[in-house]
Amino acid sequence: MSTRFPINSTFLESIDKLETGVVWVLKNLPDDAFFTVGQIATDWDGDPKAYGDRRKHPTIAPHDHLGNAGHHGHWWGVVTNTRESSGTPIEQSGKGPDQPYEHYMISATKLVDQRFKENDVRRWTDATTVPYVALPNSRRSMIKIGLKTGCYCLMVNLQSMMYCFGIYADSKAKRGRMGEISKRAVDMLGNQDGSILIVVFPASGQGKGTIPDEQTIQSK
């Protein structure tokens, strides 16, 4: 069961309201950070074994439901042969570091490593190795104060009070929800069930073309 956490808004200003709650900034430091509370949910995007067609390949065991990546004629979460959502998902060859897992699709994320091509799994932010947060797409309130892909964030499990730092590496379509975090972040926070405090630091990070490793992220 999730718990609602009261917030004293004396020194805070609301900049947005999502399905999961209000987004706040400090009144005296409105551009330094924003925060909100959401429900913890696991994001597998970027994981080389996140998605695959089990009807076509019964021996594979994808970590996430294929429907979370799209459907025939409209794929938003995996790389296709045409690089368009209407294309056919590329299946890994199982050969080499670029496509190591045969028959699995190539799961995409918002944050990329520009050194690698789109059909290379190393281009995408792996949910199993990088602690990251997924934010709602195109929220003007967040963009206005400097939110960019790759920004650093702090995540706190409000049940266990365990915390970790992460990056903004994925986006969640049109739904105004917070709390979806990478599998690695879930593991670091120690509990998948409950509420999470997410503090995002706009205009931080290394930018859209670089994926920092976990050690770099936790040193911030």
Regions found by a protein language model. Give the residues of each.
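Short helix-terminating capping/connector loops at secondary-structure junctions
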Residues: Q192-G194
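Short, solvent-exposed secondary-structure boundary/capping segments
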Residues: K174-R184
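Cell wall/extracellular polymer interaction/catalysis modules
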Residues: M1-M162, G166, R175-G176, L189-G190, ...
